[in-house]
Amino acid sequence: MIERYSREEMSNIWTDQNRYEAWLEVEILACEAWSKLGDIPAEDVKKIRENAKVDVARAQEIEQETRHDVVAFTRQVSETLGEERKWVHYGLTSTDVVDTALSYVIKQANEIIKKDLERFIDVLAQKAKDYKYTLMMGRTHGVHAEPTTFGVKMALWYTEMKRNLERFKQVRKEIEVGKMSGAVGTFANIPPEIEAYVCEHLGLDAAPVSTQTLQRDRHAYYVATLALISTSMEKFAVEIRNLQKTETREVEEAFAKGQKGSSAMPHKRNPIGSENITGIARVIRGYVTTAYENVPLWHERDISHSSAERIMLPDVTIALDYGLNRFTNIVERLTVFEDNMLANIDKTFGLIYSQRVLLALINKGLAREAAYDKVQPKAMESWETKTPFRTLIEEDATITDLLTKEDLDECFNPKHHLNQVDTIFQRAGLE
């Protein structure tokens, strides 16, 4: 991932240095496991643990000759050891090391993403509580429907991200898995005890069955989950972009002192952060196809997935980490124009209360069809003539014979739409 959309903590996880360090830890743990079985002298393992070092530049130099990164790595590590070097990579195949270490690196990335998600959820919870009763226009098909509250909108985002957190916890169980089962997964030259020891010490589960590789359905599920999380963020970002339109202006991204919105138009204050999140989500989603195409490897393995994963896995984790942090800050600092929200409710001449009038007439004894046929023409006339809907209702004696002024006051009271907000928040776990 390019530096512009990267945070240092996550980027450092995907460096060659950290990857080789993970490989080395797998190699050393395997030696320790062999020692516990009595196959490698404990003193040799001690020397390997104390003296084995990674030198990325040297390993890459050797790779120019070997054309094999793991062989180059083991030879470079061996250069830092004495006679005990013979035990490095003992009984292992390259993918025992690479796949297990990759899962370990992903686990490190997951710890950061988990913190990102939890912080975002906390910010959404606070925003929901802050604006719990802040009335605003609810829109369906982009058209005014009925009032809701900005807090309910935030509660919706909160519950969606809670679901995403649960999905993330589940996919961690699938992806944080190692394997050290040999060339075709049969443990022909390495006992299962080695795998169990290494995985336990790395905080990984051991794959019950594997070939030379971990199966890539795990990685496809993982990338798809990250893509879904990013798509939820995009959904929220698109909402902010729509609500920041000049004609609506119910919210606005924070605009810093000295910030510029346009090189040509000095007045511009654009939702560039939310637009940025939209683009990042597109990038992450684009990798889902790659992840799925990596699943059908040939027989017990091929390496067609390898080149794709070297690009894909750093990109999706770095991009999601960046996106979660940036969007959390956007939501946390979001300006909410409560007066504009109320003003927008009144823009449609009271038409948004048409269902309340319809239900009131039904409650007075009219059949639904008859009530609908009384209300709809008044609503259409209000649209076309820009006459307040209530005025047209009050001018119709066939309606006012059934509905008193008090009845109409209740129909046209926006606070009616707050009646179940407490219930919604309780159901969302926000009380």
From Swiss-Prot:
One of its GO terms (biological process) is 'de novo' AMP biosynthetic process. N(6)-(1,2-dicarboxyethyl)-AMP binds at residues 4-5, 67-69, 93-94, 212, 263, 268-270, 276, 307-311. Pathway: Purine metabolism; AMP biosynthesis via de novo pathway; AMP from IMP: step 2/2; Purine metabolism; IMP biosynthesis via de novo pathway; 5-amino-1-(5-phospho-D-ribosyl)imidazole-4-carboxamide from 5-amino-1-(5-phospho-D-ribosyl)imidazole-4-carboxylate: step 2/2. The active site is at residues 141, 262. Keywords: Lyase, Purine biosynthesis. It comes from the Bacteria. GO terms for molecular function: (S)-2-(5-amino-1-(5-phospho-D-ribosyl)imidazole-4-carboxamido) succinate lyase (fumarate-forming) activity; N6-(1,2-dicarboxyethyl)AMP AMP-lyase (fumarate-forming) activity. Its EC number is 4.3.2.2. InterPro entries: AdenyloSucc_lyase_C (IPR019468), Fumarase/histidase_N (IPR024083), Fumarate_lyase_CS (IPR020557), Fumarate_lyase_fam (IPR000362), Fumarate_lyase_N (IPR022761), L-Aspartase-like (IPR008948), Pur_lyase (IPR004769). It holds the Pfam family Lyase_1. SUPFAM superfamilies: L-aspartase-like. It catalyses: N(6)-(1,2-dicarboxyethyl)-AMP = fumarate + AMP; (2S)-2-[5-amino-1-(5-phospho-beta-D-ribosyl)imidazole-4-carboxamido]succinate = 5-amino-1-(5-phospho-beta-D-ribosyl)imidazole-4-carboxamide + fumarate. CDD domains: Adenylsuccinate_lyase_1 (cd01360). The keyword Signal does not apply. GO terms for cellular component: cytosol. SMART domains: ADSL_C. Catalyzes two reactions in de novo purine nucleotide biosynthesis. Catalyzes the breakdown of 5-aminoimidazole- (N-succinylocarboxamide) ribotide (SAICAR or 2-[5-amino-1-(5-phospho-beta-D-ribosyl)imidazole-4-carboxamido]succinate) to 5-aminoimidazole-4-carboxamide ribotide (AICAR or 5-amino-1-(5-phospho-beta-D-ribosyl)imidazole-4-carboxamide) and fumarate, and of adenylosuccinate (ADS or N(6)-(1,2-dicarboxyethyl)-AMP) to adenosine monophosphate (AMP) and fumarate. Belongs to the lyase 1 family. Adenylosuccinate lyase subfamily. Homodimer and homotetramer. Residues from neighboring subunits contribute catalytic and substrate-binding residues to each active site. NCBIfam families: purB (TIGR00928). PANTHER family: ADENYLOSUCCINATE LYASE (PTHR43172:SF1). This is Adenylosuccinate lyase. It comes from Staphylococcus saprophyticus subsp. saprophyticus (strain ATCC 15305 / DSM 20229 / NCIMB 8711 / NCTC 7292 / S-41).
